[in-house]
Curated annotation (Swiss-Prot):
Catalytic residues in the record: D250
The record's free-text note on cofactor binding: Binds 2 Zn(2+) ions per subunit.
Catalysis performed (reactions): (S)-dihydroorotate + H2O = N-carbamoyl-L-aspartate + H(+)
Domain of life where this protein originates: Bacteria
Name of protein: Dihydroorotase
Example of a GO cellular component annotation carried by this entry: cytoplasm
Residues recorded as bearing N6-carboxylysine in the entry: K102
Protein's pathway: Pyrimidine metabolism; UMP biosynthesis via de novo pathway; (S)-dihydroorotate from bicarbonate: step 3/3
Residues annotated to bind Zn(2+) 2: K102, H139, H177
Pfam families assigned to the protein according to its UniProt record, in alphabetical order: Amidohydro_1
Molecular function as annotated in GO: dihydroorotase activity; zinc ion binding
Enzyme class: hydrolase
Keywords attached to this entry: Hydrolase, Metal-binding, Pyrimidine biosynthesis, Zinc
Length: 346
């Protein structure tokens, strides 16, 4: 890393948690990620979900076809865990270059209805993943109606993550988009088989952002933004230098009219300015010197993949993201639209 007061050059980063959808909508958003990141872990929660190696490879080709000419970008593919995903598919996935499987508790978030209803049902598949070296990516929230929305992550640790670690001690697990002090502490104290991603919105904002001046649906994501004490714990984890924590935007594009709705869907779109927002968060914490490891080194090291060799440069220059982007035939409202951002990718 090279840095001055107003310029920051780091190894080209990767995004270890990304949604790009499919079809024409996908073609609208892939260029934003490809402009910033060399690789990205692609979430499999399409309709229908990506549950076979063959489907993953077909999806990968569709994503690659949306990468603008002259840009180098590698989608890293995942499978969607269901109650019925057979262990044999894990072997085929490994051979096809799939790197991970995603665990969505049924009903936890967007397009998760096919998710796992009982972890015991997938133990043979998890055993195959541990044996083959595929990572387990978890949306760490319980879905029981008797658990408060803001407590679902902490409950997931006690009810599911601790038993998973006990029963599969050498299965690498990524606790995705952590949002709480409890999650940060759990990952910090866990062994080398546990890592975590953190989004830009959870580093920059607390739950007040959803309600300032009225309901602000474009700040609504799952897991939802939490109290300021939790945000500060996430900043401390991200800037700690610990290799367990790494960049994962969870950038989740939705048509604006489906966000600005009586039952608006969850997800923040950050791919247009992701690395700039991470730089802002690290700068606010006085920890720009820790950004490169978080954004560019910790993720590939955890996945046992080579680090990138290219560089990107950010400058301290105010700019304002547009109010909207095309999203297929609809419009997409990005996170921080119309707001001045202090760092800019050049």
């Amino acid at each position: 890393m090279t840095a001055s007061t107003n310029t920051l050059t780091i190894t080209r980063p990767d995004d270890w948690h990304l949604h790009v959808r499919d079809g024409e909508a996908m073609r609208s958003v892939v260029p934003h990620t490809a402009a910033q990141f060399a690789r990205a872990i692609i979430m499999p929660n399409l309709k229908p979900p990506v549950t076979t190696a063959e489907q993953a490879l077909e999806y990968k080709q569709r994503i690659l076809s949306a990468v603008p000419e002259g840009m180098a970008f590698e989608p890293l593919m995942t499978l969607y865990l269901t109650d019925n995903l057979p262990p044999e598919e894990i072997v085929r996935a490994k051979a096809a270059g799939v790197v991970a499987c995603k665990l969505y508790p049924a009903g936890a978030t967007t397009n998760s209805d096919h998710g796992v209803t009982d972890l015991r049902k997938i133990y043979p598949t998890l055993e195959a993943m541990q044996r083959e070296g595929l990572l387990l990516l978890v949306h760490g929230e319980v879905t029981s109606s008797d658990i408060d929305l803001f407590d679902r992550e902490a409950a997931f640790i006690d009810q599911h993550l601790i038993p998973l670690r006990r029963d599969f001690p050498e299965l690498k697990i990524v606790f995705e988009h952590i949002t709480t002090r409890e999650a940060a502490q759990y990952v910090t104290e866990a062994d080398r088989f546990v890592g975590a991603t953190i989004t830009p919105q959870h580093l920059l904002f607390n739950r007040n952002a959803i309600f300032t001046g009225g309901i602000r649906p474009h700040y609504y994501c799952l897991p939802v933004l939490k109290r300021e004490t939790h945000r500060l714990a996430l900043v401390e984890a991200a800037t700690s230098g610990l290799p367990k924590f790494f960049l994962g935007t969870d950038s989740a594009p939705h048509a604006a009219h489906l966000k600005e709705h009586a039952t608006g869907c969850a997800g923040c779109y950050s791919a247009h300015a992701a690395i700039e927002m991470y730089a802002e968060a690290f700068d606010n914490a006085g920890a720009l010197d820790k950004l490169e490891a978080f954004a560019s080194f910790n993720g590939p090291d955890f996945y046992s993949l080579p680090r990138n060799t290219g560089k990107i440069t950010l400058v301290r220059e105010s700019w304002t993201p547009p109010d909207s982007f095309a999203f297929g035939e609809a419009q997409l409202k990005p996170l921080r639209s119309g707001e001045a951002l202090p760092w800019k990718l050049v």
